[in-house]
C-alpha cells in the first residue's frame, strides 16, 4: 500500500532534479574569474549557442561584455543581430577554438583567438578584456571590451 506513493514521490523528485539541470542558469561575472576564463565562458557559450535555450550562448557572451561595450552595441537584441551577422556569424556553433595570451597587466589582457567554424574555416580575432574598476556588482570583474573583426586564415582541409 505504501509502495505506490513512495514510487510516485521518487519519480517526482527525479523529475525536478533533471529539470533543474536542464535549465542551468548562465554564469555571471565575478572577481574570481580570470581574463582567459571569461573568454572561455563566452566562446563555449557561442560554440553551443542553443544548448540551454535559443541564443543562450549569445546571452552568456553578453553577460561578460563591459558596460561601455554594451553602450556601443546597444541592447541585447542588437547584440544578437551583430553576432549573427556575416561579420561574426562564424562564432555561432563553431567546432573548436584556441585562446593565446598576447599581453596583460593588472587592468587589461589581450588574447589571440582562433576559431574553426562549422564550415571548417579558421578565423583569427584579437580579444581584449579589462578589469571593471567602478563601484557596483561588477567591480573587479574581467569583462570584454573589444573583439576585432575576423581575419580568415583558410580551410582546415
Question: Predicted regions: what is each one?
Answer:
Residues 34-50, 64:
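Short, aromatic-enriched amphipathic alpha-helices that serve as compact interaction elements
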Residues 10-20:
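Bacterial N-terminal signal peptides
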Residues 22-26:
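Boundary at the C-terminal end of the N-terminal hydrophobic targeting segment
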Residues 2-12:
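Bacterial N-terminal signal peptides that target proteins for export
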Residues 52-106:
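Short solvent-exposed beta->alpha transition segments
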Residues 101-157:
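Exposed beta-sheet edge and beta->alpha loop/turn motif
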Residues 29-30:
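Alpha-helical scaffold domains
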Amino acid at each position: 500500500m505504501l509502495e505506490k506513493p513512495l514510487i510516485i514521490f521518487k519519480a517526482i523528485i527525479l523529475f525536478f532534479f533533471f529539470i533543474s539541470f536542464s535549465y542551468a542558469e548562465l554564469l555571471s561575472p565575478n572577481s574570481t574569474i580570470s581574463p582567459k576564463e571569461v573568454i572561455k565562458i563566452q566562446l563555449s557559450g557561442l560554440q553551443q549557442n542553443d544548448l540551454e535555450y535559443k541564443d543562450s550562448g549569445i546571452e552568456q557572451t553578453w553577460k561578460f561584455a563591459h558596460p561601455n561595450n554594451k553602450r556601443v552595441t546597444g541592447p541585447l537584441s542588437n547584440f544578437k543581430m551583430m553576432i549573427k551577422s556575416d561579420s561574426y556569424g562564424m562564432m555561432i556553433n563553431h567546432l573548436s577554438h584556441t585562446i593565446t595570451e598576447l599581453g596583460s597587466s593588472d587592468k587589461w589582457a589581450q588574447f589571440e583567438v582562433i576559431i574553426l567554424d562549422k564550415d571548417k574555416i579558421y578565423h583569427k580575432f584579437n580579444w581584449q578584456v579589462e578589469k571593471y574598476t567602478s563601484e557596483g556588482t561588477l567591480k573587479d570583474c574581467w569583462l570584454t571590451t573589444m573583439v576585432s573583426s575576423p581575419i580568415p586564415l583558410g580551410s582546415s582541409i
